């Protein structure tokens, strides 16, 4: 018998007691044990090492958008199984139950420090934030709504890339979203892309990288192919910080890297600086 088991308390049924599930969270970076409640108060940033934990779409709305102002859009859109991929429908159903989302992106209209915006927030907890036809359609409709309202669009990306279960239909979303953003740009309207960990594949190669202002959170991994694939293809070792947001900033691929505690205020300031009407067509 292990010595530590002698000191474990038992409940009335003789079962060993432990911490209530969800009470504590271990930081994957520094291994520090945090009270989950304190972690959430700190916007899911480790108080010991500043590691930025992944956030759900709902958590980002609560943190980023003015309280009570967010109205979601297009939640009725449902994913089908165009290629009859085995178990795909079941996996989508499980993801819906686990996340409370209809798909891997939450879109809607709200205000940021009083300024009206349209926002799209990807959630990597839903099938790794992969982009299928519904994700692409929701982002496209969000951009079109921003054009209609003549307001900025802000997109938070967190994705493993295009969704393989939808084949070419998922790849088509790269073009569709980019074209919608081109129309938004032609109207003289602001698009801020905020890349969070991870942003990869078809998402990084399309709408995530074409913002008027491209921002990332600290230590976010951003790229097309993964590090291991690139190293095996090139047969050479890559820098330790390769594909991290700070590396991309140093090499001109990003405009800024903001700590999560500063992100809301910095983006609100950028929106106020750039929001006065856009191009007026006669």
From Swiss-Prot:
Cofactor requirements of the protein: Zn(2+)
Signal sequence residues: none
ZnF start-end (C4-type): 27-49
Disulphide bridges, residue numbers: none
Molecular function as annotated in GO: acetyl-CoA carboxylase activity; ATP binding; carboxyl- or carbamoyltransferase activity; zinc ion binding
GO biological process: fatty acid biosynthetic process; malonyl-CoA biosynthetic process
Enzyme class per UniProt: transferase
E.C. numbers: 2.1.3.15
Cofactor note: Binds 1 zinc ion per subunit.
Entry keyword annotation includes Membrane: no
TM regions (residue ranges): none
Keywords: ATP-binding, Cytoplasm, Fatty acid biosynthesis, Fatty acid metabolism, Lipid biosynthesis, Lipid metabolism, Metal-binding, Nucleotide-binding, Transferase, Zinc, Zinc-finger
Residues involved in Zn(2+) binding: 27, 30, 46, 49
Highest taxon above the source species: Bacteria
Residue stretches making up the CoA carboxyltransferase N-terminal domain: 23-282
Known pathway: Lipid metabolism; malonyl-CoA biosynthesis; malonyl-CoA from acetyl-CoA: step 1/1
Family annotation (Pfam families): Carboxyl_trans, Zn_ribbon_ACC
Catalytic reactions on record: N(6)-carboxybiotinyl-L-lysyl-[protein] + acetyl-CoA = N(6)-biotinyl-L-lysyl-[protein] + malonyl-CoA
A GO cellular-component term linked to this record: acetyl-CoA carboxylase complex
Subcellular location: Cytoplasm
Subunit structure and binding partners: Acetyl-CoA carboxylase is a heterohexamer composed of biotin carboxyl carrier protein (AccB), biotin carboxylase (AccC) and two subunits each of ACCase subunit alpha (AccA) and ACCase subunit beta (AccD).
Family statement drawn from the similarity comment of this UniProt entry: Belongs to the AccD/PCCB family.
PANTHER family (alphabetical): ACETYL-COENZYME A CARBOXYLASE CARBOXYL TRANSFERASE SUBUNIT BETA, CHLOROPLASTIC (PTHR42995:SF5)
Function: Component of the acetyl coenzyme A carboxylase (ACC) complex. Biotin carboxylase (BC) catalyzes the carboxylation of biotin on its carrier protein (BCCP) and then the CO(2) group is transferred by the transcarboxylase to acetyl-CoA to form malonyl-CoA.
Protein name: Acetyl-coenzyme A carboxylase carboxyl transferase subunit beta 1
Organism listed in the record: Lysinibacillus sphaericus (strain C3-41)
Gene of this entry: accD1
């Amino acid at each position: 018998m292990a010595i530590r088991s002698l000191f474990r308390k038992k409940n009335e049924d003789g079962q060993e007691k432990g911490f209530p599930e969800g009470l504590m969270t271990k930081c994957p970076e520094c291994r520090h044990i945090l009270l989950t409640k304190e972690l959430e108060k700190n916007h899911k940033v480790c108080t010991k090492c500043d590691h930025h934990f992944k956030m759900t779409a709902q958590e980002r709305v609560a943190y980023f958008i003015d309280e009570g102002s967010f109205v979601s859009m297009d939640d009725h859109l449902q994913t089908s199984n165009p290629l009859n991929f085995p178990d795909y429908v079941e996996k989508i159903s499980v993801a819906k139950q686990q996340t409370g989302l209809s798909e891997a992106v939450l879109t809607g209209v709200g205000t940021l420090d009083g300024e009206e915006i349209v926002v799209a927030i990807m959630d990597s907890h839903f099938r790794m934030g992969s982009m299928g036809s519904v994700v692409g359609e929701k982002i496209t409709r969000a951009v079109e709504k921003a054009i209609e309202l003549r307001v900025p669009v802000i997109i938070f990306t967190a994705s493993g890339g295009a969704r393989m279960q939808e084949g070419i239909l998922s790849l088509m979303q790269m073009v569709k979203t980019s074209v919608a953003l081109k129309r938004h740009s032609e109207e003289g309207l602001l698009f801020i892309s905020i890349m969070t960990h991870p942003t990869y594949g078809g998402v990084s190669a399309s709408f995530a990288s074409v913002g008027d202002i491209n921002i990332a959170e600290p230590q976010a991994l951003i790229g097309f192919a993964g590090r291991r694939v690139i190293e095996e293809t090139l047969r050479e070792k890559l820098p330790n910080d390769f594909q991290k947001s700070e590396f991309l900033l140093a090499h001109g691929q990003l405009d800024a890297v903001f700590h999560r505690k500063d992100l809301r205020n910095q983006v609100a300031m950028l929106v106020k600086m750039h929001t006065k009407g856009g191009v007026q067509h006669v």
